[in-house]
Swiss-Prot record:
Gene3D superfamilies documented for this protein: 3.30.70.100, Rhodanese-like domain
Protein name as it appears in the record: tRNA uridine(34) hydroxylase
Source organism of this protein record: Bacillus anthracis
A GO term, aspect molecular function: oxidoreductase activity, acting on paired donors, with incorporation or reduction of molecular oxygen
PROSITE patterns: RHODANESE_3 (PS50206)
Alphabetized CDD domains for the sequence: RHOD_YceA (cd01518)
Residue ranges of coiled coil: none
Boundaries of every Rhodanese domain copy: 127-221
Pfam families: Rhodanese, Rhodanese_C, UPF0176_N
Similarity field: Belongs to the TrhO family.
Residues passing through the membrane, by range: none
Catalytic site: C181 (cysteine persulfide intermediate)
Enzyme Commission identifier(s): 1.14.-.-
Gene: trhO
Amino acid sequence: MATTKPYRVLLYYMYTTIENPEEFAAEHLEFCNSLELKGRILVAKEGINGTCSGTVEQTEKYMEAMNNDPRFDGIVFKIDEADGHAFKKMHVRPRPELVTLRLEDDINPHEITGKYLEPKDFYEAMKQEDTVIIDARNDYEFDLGHFKGAIKPDIESFRELPDWIRENKEVLEGKKILTYCTGGIRCEKFSGWLVREGYEDVSQLHGGIVTYGKDPEVQGELWDGQCYVFDERIAVPVNQKEHVIVGKDHFTGEPCERYVNCANPECNKKILCSEENEAKYLRACSHECRVSPRNRYVIQHELTEEQVAAALEKIEAGK
């Protein structure tokens, strides 16, 4: 691929057997540090799920080493160019599972999963009338961007998705089901779970939103907004043909694609808001969070009690 920027961000996963995740994680961290990569990699007995950043040379060495390991034969790396690192540190952590579903009877995607649809086929399937499109991500990811007509499950974490489906099964009955997520890993299990639940026509977007946005044929069409990513970039573009902002400012409802975390560390909720509203509302999602003694915005900007009181008065006056 033609390279114009000095850094890359790699996104990848693979369901494969790793006998001793703890030992592998420790050795892999050492290896990543030796290459000076930064990122977050999860390791489980069922495989690996990672995203990391480094220079072109560093990421090439990493991909070469992974491809030379028979456990990761056929692994696919999704590559984004970047101006610098997308992470502050390097973490490699063992986990009970790669994506947290916590099912009593776990899903093995090698044994049961939905049909894979390449971007063009997924694009065509979305336009069919008897199709229902389910976003398998969290609510804050959906709020920043999603496929036109996609259903937003009212969930804050992936493990809540099966219960939501059971409670809303009338939406899916008799329909062709399409599922999608950022890179594909969540849908491998989620679509498999749907098949096991008895849904007959279940498909998943192969390679996820990231692959869809890079596909030269579809060019991200039918996607509105941006794609939430779990690194310092926060959002990446998908639709190369038109950019429609779907995110709404938490405070005013105006179009917005800027995420911040609520300044109250006990809340830490992700909220969309402009720089102006961040300052006006002390980066807090509610009055309770604004007056929290641990409000990070207040501490960071060394605001006095008088300044905080004035800000609260201004908010009250504007209601």
